[in-house]
């Protein structure tokens, strides 16, 4: 382990040393560019564009372009990037992750690679976690880019397609990760190319890259349509589930958060719903509703996993503590929670398009990111995104004091100690930021502080709209701020007058998160830019992490110490080591899950790419689509004829071929059964294709205007493809949910999913061919065709 860490640090040092030489070149232009007039400095932008057009590369012009962006920032923003920020900028340009501590100026660091890459004219996306940060950075940094002659676009959810198109056509586009993903999906659902908004995905710099590419990696972006209602079944399942007893009727496995009925529970369900066998095929809808109701009632916790506001169930992001507006749990879990909470049950939805962030961001030609905390996930970034994590040195040495964890026997004794600590700091005027893992604990702590007359601000999923304002004041003398994990990422906590003398900002963690990275983010709020600061984590044996993964060694250690007093406090390196070992175990599990998600999602990615590519060819076509439609008809004819001409001619089923032809291709007068008799299979295929060719020619005559024929073909293909594709997405979802339950003995579920998924995809393509054949051959021509 020690050798691994040593090589890790040395490889970073080597990389930083290499980039330091490039930074020297950037800094060598400092005096020359500071003497240029504004006009001369601004004239560098068209000069660089010309040089790129004449064959120079972005790497060739990097030192000069970075130096121009740096001098421009000094003149326009009053900020001059430090040497370490230049190194961070080079890291981003090279498609890697710059790990920069809080307060080291990530936003300013990004201006140099953004400017350089925007010169190529293919678009640069700056990606943030929320619209507040997108708007702020587009406005503030936009001044610099505009001054240097580049256009800046802001892509917000509320914008019209025209406004979005303008934003994407700008040299630099600011957007949230979710809006980028949804725009990509919507672009692949349009029926007219003019409705598309995005350009090809070129270069993205992702701010808070760990939050987007790790924490949200498994979150699928889903565009849904309404499906059929089954409200009554959710209510019945909920009423039944509420009568069950833990252990007797159902069992919960907390480490995996899975729940299942016992034999007794199954018996009760069969009696309650009047069934012989709960797991019969015809009862799958009911078992699905029961599974979701069990999860909703006994695993999903109010004010931790979700909150209820104004009669609506809203998801709480477990990593940021924010309410995820507009997001709903899939597979009926959201409806089951609505039944549990007695609020209106909203209609279930059908997925029409979906993609995960992992697969969306891997489509960029070049991807980079910045964050204060990424080293703990370095392997994942390298394996999944092919990005290295480079730790950028701080501009000034870190002066923060990170104290060892303290452990209490109970939640009550822990919170008692936390309140005592906060109160003493408040009384001497030292600002304190208190991090909690859940909304529930932030509200409990708030009540305890009220009882102790300590004024404070609370920042959690219920009032995140005040986030920037609360965080801005968190460094003032005597300020006490309670925040869930998000702790205002993206907004710096600046120290007020006199606070440095009091020891700077104190950060108190009320429990360890299951991810070390989230703990490090909280620590990083203190001691920015060389300021003093202090951090302390409080834990109890009743904390979630300790309950789920607290080792036997900790329990044995406490027994040996004979600790029974509620206020007893333990501070031991062994405890800290055990906690970190538990965190590493959880991180390993989470990484394996994300990796598995990606392997499953790659099956859908390949299929999605095939469908989207073919769909795009149809939308972009400017000539007739005969080259697309005739092969579809030919494949359908071949399949039907081959199916019914197996073995001896006496066994052939010519009636079935005739039925297909008259229902899907021609009228009964055109083709009698006698015309098929006495012919070989190849001759039958040729005869049917002759009808297809004649039909095509007739339609072309009827639609003498070339555009009308093309429009008719596009209508037919797009309608069929879209309907079959959305059904296929749904079927693949169901396959994925059921594949683990199948009794395949020693078979690998992923291999089964890949093989079955491929078979279903082939089947869907056949269905598309068949439906297109029938619709094209049988459709009556109407004027004013619209897609």
From Swiss-Prot:
Residues reported in the UniProt entry to bind ATP: 85, 103-107, 492
Enzyme class of the recorded protein, top EC level: translocase
Alphabetized Pfam families for the sequence: P-loop_SecA, SecA_DEAD, SecA_PP_bind, SecA_SW
Primary location recorded for the protein, binned into one broad class: membrane
GO terms for cellular component: cell envelope Sec protein transport complex; cytosol; plasma membrane
Assigned keywords, A-Z: ATP-binding, Cell membrane, Cytoplasm, Membrane, Nucleotide-binding, Protein transport, Translocase, Translocation, Transport
Reactions catalysed, as given in the entry: ATP + H2O + cellular proteinSide 1 = ADP + phosphate + cellular proteinSide 2
Membrane-topology annotation of the record: Peripheral membrane protein
GO molecular function: ATP binding; protein-exporting ATPase activity
InterPro entries noted in UniProt: Helicase_ATP-bd, Helicase_C-like, P-loop_NTPase, SecA, SecA_CS, SecA_DEAD, SecA_motor_DEAD, SecA_preprotein_X-link_dom
Function according to Swiss-Prot or TrEMBL: Part of the Sec protein translocase complex. Interacts with the SecYEG preprotein conducting channel. Has a central role in coupling the hydrolysis of ATP to the transfer of proteins into and across the cell membrane, serving as an ATP-driven molecular motor driving the stepwise translocation of polypeptide chains across the membrane.
Family: Belongs to the SecA family.
Subunit structure: Monomer and homodimer. Part of the essential Sec protein translocation apparatus which comprises SecA, SecYEG and auxiliary proteins SecDF. Other proteins may also be involved.
Protein name (database record): Protein translocase subunit SecA
Gene for this chain: secA
